[in-house]
Regions:
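Short Gly/Thr/Asp-enriched flexible loops that form oxyanion-binding sites at enzyme active sites
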Residues: 160-170
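A charged, well-structured terminal subsegment
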Residues: 198-219
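Active-site alpha/beta core segments
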Residues: 41-144
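Short glycine-enriched, charge-decorated loop/helix-capping segments at active-site entrances
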Residues: 30-37
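Active-site-proximal loop->helix
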Residues: 183-197
Length: 219
């Protein structure tokens, strides 16, 4: 009896990396998420692997306009009262330089624009948890014929998790790079496994792309 098709295994040859909320305030600033700073070196390796393989990269950032009301409900009161978290045009909102040297175009991002920072590499602003909510992410990935969303970044239980669920709901294959994501626990990985999300390490990704490059050279 046939086991049927495999609809969930990552297809890295048709993948895009979505790096979520890796910004100075969350790495080492006043709103830091424990464990994020320690994972920046793995994130840098992951970015290098995708860049070398010429696969798409999307940096997703969170921006809170001081005093603005378009913030998620758990943080809205704090933002309205003057607290600054990843405020546009501040160092806290920037992506660490070792991950992205290009400055962010905050005004364009807040207006819903897609900022192109290098060949195959863009930045998008998301106003809530999921990178798919009120963004151009799905259209961008479809235009590039991507079928696998590889997620890494800051604080798995919040934005990476929401993004992985939304990727699955849109019939993308989905994978989480565990050593390049903060706040990973066995319980959270078990929840993701139930919706078909597979786990990878940075070394897994590097080895796949290195093997693919070697195979192509031999042809």
């Amino acid at each position: 009896m046939s086991a049927g098709h495999d609809y969930t295994s990552p297809d890295l040859a048709r993948s895009a990396l979505v790096l979520i909320d890796v910004q100075n305030d969350f790495v080492s600033g006043p709103s830091q998420v424990d464990g994020t700073g320690e994972r920046v070196p793995a994130m840098a390796r992951l970015l290098a692997a995708f860049r070398a393989a010429h696969r798409p990269i999307v940096h997703i950032v969170r921006l809170y306009v001081p005093g603005g009301s378009d913030a998620d409900p758990p943080r809205r009161a704090a933002i309205e009262s003057g607290k600054q978290i990843a405020a546009p045009h501040t160092d806290g909102a920037a992506v660490p330089g070792e991950l992205l040297a290009h400055p962010l175009d905050y005004d364009s991002l807040l207006a819903g624009g897609v900022q192109h920072v290098a060949a195959g590499e863009v930045v998008m602003f998301k106003p809530r948890w999921s990178a798919f909510y009120r963004t151009a992410l799905e259209e961008h990935l479809r235009d590039l014929a991507v079928n696998t969303v590889v997620v890494a970044g800051c604080n798995l239980p919040n934005c990476p998790r929401a993004t992985l669920f939304d990727a699955s709901e849109r019939d993308f294959r989905a994978a989480l790079v565990t050593d390049a994501t903060s706040q990973v626990t066995p319980e959270r990985l078990a929840d993701l496994a139930l919706i078909g999300v597979e786990t990878l390490t940075t070394a897994d990704v590097e080895q796949f792309f290195e093997a693919a490059a070697t195979s192509q050279e031999r042809q």
